[in-house]
Amino acid sequence: MPIIKSAIERAKTNVKANERNSAQLSTMRTAVKRFEQAKTAGADNAEELYRKASAAVDKAASKGLIKRNKASRDKSRMAARLAK
């Protein structure tokens, strides 16, 4: 356990940031998964779900949760999947 006051504060901040980042990543993964499931099932709303998933990936990349190249790769793969 930290003893120094600033270390205690940083530990609290790290816990909050971890929760926030985990929630954001989970939201992104869920959006991508919903798009994949809709496309597999042949649902009509696949294009709308693609836009939501793409926005979620962009948001995660802008916040530094995933790297820009991964975001670009994921979006490219989803776009190719949508075009099929």
From Swiss-Prot:
Q: Which Gene3D superfamilies match?
A: Ribosomal protein S20 (1.20.58.110)
Briefly state the protein's biological role. Binds directly to 16S ribosomal RNA.
For this UniProt record, give its keywords in alphabetical order, as a comma-separated list. Answer: Ribonucleoprotein, Ribosomal protein, RNA-binding, rRNA-binding
GO terms under cellular component: cytosol; small ribosomal subunit
InterPro entries, per database record? Ribosomal_bS20, Ribosomal_bS20_sf
Q: Name one GO molecular function term.
A: structural constituent of ribosome
Gene name of this polypeptide: rpsT
Name it.
Small ribosomal subunit protein bS20
Some GO term, biological process aspect, for this entry: which one? translation
User: Could you say which protein family the record assigns here?
Assistant: Belongs to the bacterial ribosomal protein bS20 family.
